[in-house]
């Protein structure tokens, strides 16, 4: 089970400070997780300018130009935000026994290390 999933609120914990033009300390929602490269795409974080070549789309409209998009960031540079305290926290796991249709199953639940509450 992954510690960070799509839709989680994370905070950047490394890099340049926000007052110096960096993203450290900023919080954002995870848009996509790339498990093969250990990277995440976070909303509003690591924005870069992308220069695309001018061409034509199938509708005949001109495409291309300069656009600002989010680039991925390594998963070790972000920390999950505890929903109760709104501060970054480490993630742990706890197993719970759940009974469905008369069958017992063990389910792993993500837990915030700082507060001990479920995420």
Curated annotation (Swiss-Prot):
GO cellular component: ribonucleoprotein complex; ribosome
GO molecular function terms attached to this record: rRNA binding; structural constituent of ribosome
Pfam family, one: ribosomal_L24
Keywords assigned: Ribonucleoprotein, Ribosomal protein, RNA-binding, rRNA-binding
Gene Ontology annotations of biological process type: translation
InterPro entries named among the record's database cross-references: KOW, Rib_uL2_dom2, Ribosomal_uL24, Ribosomal_uL24_KOW, Translation_prot_SH3-like_sf
Domain of life: Bacteria
Coiled coil regions, renumbered to chain: none
SUPFAM superfamilies assigned: Translation proteins SH3-like domain (SSF50104)
Family (UniProt): Belongs to the universal ribosomal protein uL24 family.
Subunit record text: Part of the 50S ribosomal subunit.
Role, per record: One of two assembly initiator proteins, it binds directly to the 5'-end of the 23S rRNA, where it nucleates assembly of the 50S subunit.
Protein name: Large ribosomal subunit protein uL24
Lineage of the species this protein comes from: Bacteria, Bacillati, Actinomycetota, Actinomycetes, Micrococcales
């Amino acid at each position: 089970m992954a510690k960070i999933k799509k839709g989680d609120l994370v905070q950047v914990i490394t890099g340049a400070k926000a007052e110096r033009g960096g993203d450290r300390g900023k919080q954002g929602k995870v848009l996509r997780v790339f498990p093969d490269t250990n990277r995440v795409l976070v909303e509003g974080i690591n924005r870069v300018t992308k220069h695309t070549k001018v061409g034509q789309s199938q509708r005949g409209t001109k495409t291309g130009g300069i656009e600002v998009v989010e680039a991925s960031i390594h998963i070790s540079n972000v920390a999950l935000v505890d929903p109760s305290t709104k501060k970054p926290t480490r993630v742990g796991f706890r197993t719970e026994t759940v009974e469905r249709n008369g069958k017992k199953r063990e389910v792993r639940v993500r837990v915030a290390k700082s507060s001990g509450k479920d995420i």
